[in-house]
């Protein structure tokens, strides 16, 4: 019999879910007492690991003082102001501001709206086109569904948001052609610097630089979706730092709190904020009930403290080198078709005839969590506190799952 809970990204008729009841570090435990190495940081987000007492204590203290309150005009709170300042200090854009929401999906939809709105405020209401890329994942709200480049996730929902153009990933000539065609109707180009749920695809050499040049040439904003890549995953605070290419808007979520409380946001760079701030009578009419929620902001502050104190941004390099070496050893032994990744997020493409979902399930039975995405890919995005021994067990389990297929 199905439960009352309708699961996301699952068959509505499925009944045999594994119930996770606790977590500590990189290990989670299910209701049957089985332990798993969480090689996906839950869903790309638990950077500091599970069961961090400092975050739990900070939440309890905050809840006893101010658990929640609106930040709509005329209100604010000390925690959201402190977090905004903290985030701007590590932002890839100088003189940015921060808009808060509760998820990456909300962040993407907000970035799309702000890009279009900034053009309206600058006197260019014709600039409405958003260009996105194939394989891109940008959440499942209506805006994100409309721009994402994973076709099955777009199907069945009727008409989506208009004025969206999609181009092949990493094909700078295709992007140049699309931008020439749409010209001064383009609002923004939206990219994941490293595509995540689409299969973990880092950018090709020079691609992001080319996108920036084209945006400047055509007067379009560049939006980075850093919901997965932000907060140390690539060995830098943000992918914009990693690749040295400046965007105009950056979305974030996931590892900003390591998932202890949902939080998302958008860095609003100078080119966008200047358009929004130019008219003192302009009133920004977008936001969410929980924008700047004190508990979420407190969780983020405690989480960032841990990342800084424990050097987890730097540790991502070590994790990436060790995980990459292990996965490439499988490729050298002709066990996988391809290895892709950057920093501490990696994937393997299975050889023809190997089902990544079956690999996922076999690894679960061996006590290791991976994800299966697309037709051939298994992904790995472990907590940044994972030990070397745990990383080696991940690779060993993957090897065993493939060789016993």
Predicted segments, located by residue:
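Conserved N-terminal phosphate-binding loop of PLP-dependent enzymes in the Aspartate aminotransferase
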Residues: 1-405
